[in-house]
Amino acid sequence: MANTTLTLDIIGMTCAACSNRIEKKLNRMNHVQAKVNLTTEKATIDYESDDYHLEDFVEQIQSLGYDVAVEQVELNINGMTCAACSNRIEKVLNQTQGVQQATVNLTTEQALIKYYPSATNTEALIKRIQNIGYDAETKTSSKAQSNRKKQELKHKRNKLIISAILSLPLLLVMVVHISPISIPSILVNPWVQLILSTPVQFIIGWQFYVGAYKNLRNGSANMDVLVAVGTSAAYFYSIYEMMMWLTHQTHHPHLYFETSAILITLILLGKYLEARAKSQTTNALSELLNLQAKEARVIKENKEIMLPLDKVKVGDTLLIKPGEKIPVDGKVTKGDTSIDESMLTGESIPVEKSSGDSVIGSTMNKNGSIMIEATQVGGDTALSHIIKVVEDAQSSKAPIQRLADIISGYFVPIVVSIAVITFIIWIIFVHPGQFEPALVSAISVLVIACPCALGLATPTSIMVGTGRAAENGILFKGGQFVERAHYVDTIVLDKTGTITNGQPVVTDYVGDNDTLQLLASAENASEHPLADAIVTYAKDKGLNLLDNDTFKSIPGHGIKATIHQQQILVGNRKLMNDYNISISNKLNDQLNHYEHLGQTAMMIAVDNQINGIIAVADTVKNDAKQAIKELRNMNIDVVMLTGDNNRTAQTIAKQVGIEHVIAEVLPEEKAHQISLLQDKGKQVAMVGDGINDAPALVKADIGMAIGTGAEVAIEAADITILGGDLLLVPKAIKASKATIKNIRQNLFWAFGYNVAGIPIAACGLLAPWIAGAAMALSSVSVVMNALRLKKMKL
């Protein structure tokens, strides 16, 4: 057995006990010698390679509560022609030492690879791809990639034009066989046909030979193999016929030069149309990229300097004039203006900005000159994060693609086998001893089969669907979430900031100003949304705030503070009961009254004596009732989940049309409530702000983070709703359902085309050129069907 040495970067070690624990765990494995260095945070492992895989050691380390460093790289891949290619590359990468997971997308021509940096690197991964016959490079900027694809499209167009010019005369020869029209006799000359077809076969069509050779050399087969074998059979049979004619001069040869040339031309036409259609699938991403400013006006040494955007650094001072885009995320340091943030929030009304306010890159400055300090630049800006989410979603795979991937892996060998069987049956049984009909039928089988349509069926729909959703402010994190969302039958909505605006105001206060001063001073240390409303209310009354000696937040109950040796309690009935503070019937009636109105009522106790009541209300979003109505019309059960008291929650629920309410739930219990719904067989989506309900978002089958501007937690959820518009929640479900429906249509067409087309070709009912045209158009039709999603109404 061969010995192998492996080094892993470990995350989470804090002391020698950690490193010793990991070392002991690894050394308990048979035939393993491990040393863990706390200083370098690395584990060096010697083991017998036949006994273990890298993942075995990672699993052992993770079982102790530590992790192994993983990096991610995106590669552009050139040379893929069909699903067999992408599947081959993906399989090889996933079998590579050090790779955690790799996915290859035929539509975007990219690979997304997660790997252990101490076990492999980008250069090794690129070399691995090159060794199986494809070209790979580290992903360039989206703009550079767009320019490269434009050049590739132009190159494909030029090849198509040349091939068409050479093949057109041969097409006329083919027409003579099926119609009585006359053509110049020179075109029937075998030598002319040879001269016209040879450049098409071996210069224009050389790419098919190269692709076939590379795949066969590595023990696999793809579309190039089918095209190369099929067209070569027609071409070289024609050469054979010419040689027999020159030798015997007995009859005019039966030539198929036109078949090989026209097949190649039609396939090139299909590939060109496919590339053009695929370029349209990234329009949404292109539009996002176009939102970015190209340069910024930076103030240095009291001078204005125009710099490219990539030269701007955090801390730079920028001047933005009216009508200009905000170049980067920043904070206003001087001036007042209004900003159009509709590109991010969907809200058409400009937002007023003054000194100290945050601004978002790529939004539009409307009517005032301002100076800002850059806080986020380059890939860290809000728009860059959005673009990254869209790119990742468009490059990802949906689980529904697995069947197509499995079939594509065996597709070409099966088709070649069917072609051979077809040839044998025809030459032995159908037309015994006749070579031509057998050859023509076999060629038709080879060229009608299309693994491309199978490979494009899912990713093109995912690209267009997620792009269209992004245009509407809905960001899917990946194809798997597009698929998972269409199964959702229950949506759980957090109340504050989701159903309501999240900007509460004080509606009633019963008590004196001294109590209000103590109340506001205590709440000033709290981060709860209601606290801001109380502090603002007290300041508007002209009260000065006092310093807290101590402060404690009691989730689900309220707060406790000490101010000038006085104990202050602010909260609900539970809090008062915990401190044995009695609540009179009159006080309880007042609480019930406020709660019946949908307000949150809190009592203020000073030294265990209730001195006042304050009621705070949060207004319901204008679109909440309509959004919930749309969800219910889609047969989706809507649940409100809140920490607020049941009476207030029921009042808000009644306003918006929610029947199922789960109230008085502590933040840490929200995830448990999601589990209870899932235990009933529900497919649950949780909608919240992604911050204080993150565990519930993670626990749900689909987590949706909803928020405004740069504050929305994109990383916290599977789907991000920009702008805080609750109507985007049903739209997200609609986008998911429409995309999955489109994928199923594509898969049905791709499978059905091959299942029906191959037997028809084998029966000799299709001429090779018709079979080739059908093959070329099959993949185009799949892409065109996916493009229909660009017009879907959400």
Swiss-Prot record:
The chain crosses the membrane at residues 161-181, 186-206, 225-245, 255-275, 410-430, 437-457, 747-767, 773-789. This is Copper-exporting P-type ATPase. It comes from the Bacteria. The gene is copA. Its EC number is 7.2.2.8. Mg(2+) binds at residues 689, 693. Cu(+) 1 binds at residues 15, 18. It is an enzyme of class 7 (translocase). InterPro entries: ATPase_P-typ_cyto_dom_N, ATPase_P-typ_P_site, ATPase_P-typ_TM_dom_sf, ATPase_P-typ_transduc_dom_A_sf, HAD-like_sf, HAD_sf, Heavy-metal-associated_CS, HMA_Cu_ion-bd. Residues 4-69, 71-137 form the HMA domain. It is a multi-pass membrane protein. It comes from Staphylococcus epidermidis (strain ATCC 35984 / DSM 28319 / BCRC 17069 / CCUG 31568 / BM 3577 / RP62A). Pfam families: E1-E2_ATPase, HMA, Hydrolase. GO terms for biological process: copper ion homeostasis. Gene3D superfamilies: 3.30.70.100, Calcium-transporting ATPase, cytoplasmic domain N (3.40.1110.10), Calcium-transporting ATPase, cytoplasmic transduction domain A (2.70.150.10), HAD superfamily/HAD-like (3.40.50.1000). The active site is at 494 (4-aspartylphosphate intermediate). Cu(+) 2 binds at residues 82, 85. Keywords: ATP-binding, Cell membrane, Copper, Copper transport, Ion transport, Magnesium, Membrane, Metal-binding, Nucleotide-binding, Phosphoprotein, Repeat, Translocase, Transmembrane, Transmembrane helix, Transport. GO terms for molecular function: ATP binding; ATP hydrolysis activity; copper ion binding; P-type divalent copper transporter activity; P-type monovalent copper transporter activity. SUPFAM superfamilies: Calcium ATPase, transduction domain A, Calcium ATPase, transmembrane domain M, HAD-like, HMA, heavy metal-associated domain. Belongs to the cation transport ATPase (P-type) (TC 3.A.3) family. Type IB subfamily.
